[in-house]
């Protein structure tokens, strides 16, 4: 029994060897399978781990350098920004100071120009007045040498216009007192006979109530020098003269005066208005005192 089993096993072995010889050598294993088997897989894993570690170290080193460079750039930019802001602020301050200085210089220049213009105007007025006074004095000397028979120029402080001399007061009097003042100067309150004379007088008196030589105290309106009123020049305000009694001063309005716009109005003769004296050039005789 044992021998038979051995024979059978021997036959199986021969059959197996014969079968293997018939099939040929076993096929080679793939490279990946060989690498992943056993110690080779361990070595490959260690190699990859080392490679990854090197890569991580390199990337970390580069990242640290980049962060350091970025930090340096930030500090540089911050310093540059602060420096630029300081410079801009300094320039703004300097610009403001320059602007204020320019404005101050402009104001000083304008003031100097204004003062110079005023000085120039004042100088011209003084020169004009000096020339007028010199001419008047020369005229008066000539009149004295001719025994005062005829005057060819106006006294000092009188203004010549169309062969007449005018004196403009700077204080106020009632109409009758103003009329007496002019008579004492061998003159009369101004008599306006033309639009040209109206403009001349209005220019000198300005917007101030001023007596003229026209009244109706004795009835009809008349000029103090006898000039015909009815046919002569007139420049009344609308609805004037009205001889108004509502002023509460007693009586009506009997004396004429220039108003602030130059037109005429009748008013109470007792009001203290300025006045204008007039005399013909060949009658002017002496200089009145300033009031």
UniProtKB/Swiss-Prot annotation:
Phosphoserine: residues carrying this PTM: 16, 285
CDD domains xref list: CLECT_DC-SIGN_like
Keyword line: Calcium, Coiled coil, Disulfide bond, Endocytosis, Glycoprotein, Host-virus interaction, Lectin, Lipoprotein, Membrane, Metal-binding, Palmitate, Phosphoprotein, Receptor, Secreted, Signal-anchor, Transmembrane, Transmembrane helix
PTM info: Phosphorylated on a cytoplasmic Ser residue.
Positions in the Extracellular compartment: 62-291
Additional note from the record: Calcium is required for ligand binding.
Oligomer and partners: Interacts with LASS2. (Microbial infection) Interacts with hepatitis E virus capsid protein ORF2.
Protein name, entry field: Asialoglycoprotein receptor 1
Species per Swiss-Prot/TrEMBL record: Homo sapiens
Lineage: Eukaryota, Metazoa, Chordata, Craniata, Vertebrata
Gene: ASGR1
């Amino acid at each position: 029994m044992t021998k038979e089993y051995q024979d059978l096993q021997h036959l199986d072995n021969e059959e197996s060897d014969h079968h293997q010889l018939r099939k040929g050598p076993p096929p080679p294993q793939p490279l990946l399978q060989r690498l992943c088997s056993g110690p080779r897989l361990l070595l490959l894993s260690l190699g990859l781990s080392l490679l990854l570690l090197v890569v991580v170290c390199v990337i970390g080193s580069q990242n640290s350098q980049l962060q350091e460079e970025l930090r340096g750039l930030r500090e540089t930019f911050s310093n540059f920004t602060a420096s630029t802001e300081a410079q801009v602020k300094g320039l703004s301050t300097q610009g403001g100071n320059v602007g204020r200085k320019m404005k101050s210089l402009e104001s000083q220049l304008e003031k100097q120009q204004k003062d110079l213009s005023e000085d120039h105007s004042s100088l011209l007025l003084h020169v004009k007045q000096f020339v007028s006074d010199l001419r008047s004095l020369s005229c008066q000397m000539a009149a004295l040498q001719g025994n005062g028979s005829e005057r060819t120029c106006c006294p000092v402080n009188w203004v010549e216009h169309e062969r007449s001399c005018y004196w403009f007061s700077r204080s106020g009097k009632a109409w009758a007192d103003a009329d007496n003042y002019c008579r004492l100067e061998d003159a009369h309150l101004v008599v306006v006979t033309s639009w040209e004379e109206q403009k001349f007088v209005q220019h000198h008196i300005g917007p101030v109530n001023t007596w003229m030589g026209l009244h109706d105290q004795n009835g009809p309106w008349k000029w103090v020098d006898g000039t015909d009123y009815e046919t002569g020049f007139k420049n009344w305000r609308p609805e004037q003269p009205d001889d108004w009694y509502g002023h509460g001063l007693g009586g009506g309005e009997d004396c004429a005066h220039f108003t602030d716009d130059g037109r005429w109005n009748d008013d109470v003769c007792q009001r203290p208005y300025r006045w204008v004296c007039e005399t013909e050039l060949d009658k002017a005789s002496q200089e009145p005192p300033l009031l």
